């Protein structure tokens, strides 16, 4: 009996410990784990499970990402020490302790179940997103809140933080609150910088070529982490070429602070220094005062990224084509070919890229997006998984994986991948917009609107969150708000010129206008809706949504009890064109459905149904039903209609 009783008493403690598991999603550089009760640090491994009491530390040029059991994501910066602590209120409350370093916290599920500690303060998380920094007991603890609410407590009191606020806890435990800087600036250390150096441009001495051989070989192969690990320790006698290579590897691995320190030691007017400054400016969307024509392959590749940040896609593609034959250069060409929707050229370029640099993660990610465009979901998922195996912090690969899983109907997995994408690169407005779409589709408008707001705050010129939020409002019959957001999306359309060529921008505007036409019609502005749909067709005649809108509009103008059915031929023509242009399974085959151009966040269902019935006091009945869907790329629709008219029927005057 005593054994049984002691066993029952232990169960809550065991359940609490097991409830707070986490796994290492990805890491780069030297990252080590210390198990609870052990004194021996061991190297980290991807997907390694950590338990309460375990510790994780990152080296000088290292990062790691943990996903907790409640789907919280911790993005841990270099030189950090983190411990997962036993719950303070088993089994609900979970805790982690940041002894030193910096982390980014993101949770969109149940953030109220987590607490954190630093040497100076504790925090109760009632928010979902913040940046936390600690410097032991001798330095300050700093917290900047992007979204939600956090209660920060010390022996001197408690401070409640709202979104956009930050707090500093000094060694004497006093708390000072202030307004935070812009959200995008708070997460600058999470930015991803492209690799641009062509090692053939380096003027290395023979002895330097030998000492850097392993690192250079890994870099040419596209393996930035291996190149970082193979770098010899810096010495005072390092030549400018050695410093340039070290700078390139550090920047591509994400350690921009160390890279900028090295950049300051290079000659300001050197070709390499200009190239690296252009890359940093491109990622931060900053302007560069002077742009002399590059004289190296590295310079042209850096110029390509900078010109894209200035919305000069043609110039960017021309610069990439002058950047040589490296895997990095061919990957860049493939990315820009995709921006012009030139899929054949993109396929040739990405094949060359992978042949030249088989371990370069962005190359596999680009090929994944190509396969996704071709609806080869198995191949796309394999490419994205390969990219993530090489670099688990690549946000584009997580996004591609999410979109692919969504197309396969694996909605929950897709949303988890989107959360990881947002955690890897929290400054990317596009990732937040996609995550908000997922919440909207799953019927969670509060979380959706929260991420839409954050996406707008990260990039006020991005039309994507306005478009998606407008469609979200339309799904919940909030059409006035939908009109407002869709109008703003149309107004901001050309701000996407950083990523889209002119032809694709026109297609984007057509999509926005077609959806805006539906919203106008829903609020009773029929004539405005017609004109907006006409503009959509003028921008892009291949926009199936605009043709579908025209078909529905003509159908409403028909009079089934009159002799004049002149709209029927035009309606059938528009419906035929819409179905020829539309992707399969969008429900457009049916003549009974209302306008079906709402974005389907994660793909159409295999089977869906719609129906209505109408009865009039004169004895007339009108009913219709439709079954439609998509199975393995095949779209279908089955319509039925039954009508009885008590003495009235079409063309009854003959």
What are the roles of these predicted feature ranges?
Residues 220, 252, 309, 339, ...:
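Register position in tetratricopeptide repeats
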Residues 237, 269, 322-326, 356, ...:
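Structural marker of alpha-solenoid helical repeat scaffolds
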Residues 17-207, 213-214:
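Flexible, surface-exposed loop/linker segments and immediately adjacent secondary-structure boundaries
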Residues 573-654:
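Outer-membrane beta-barrel translocator/receptor signature
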Residues 208, 240-241, 271, 297, ...:
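Helix-start (N-cap) detector for alpha-helical repeat units in TPR-like alpha-solenoids
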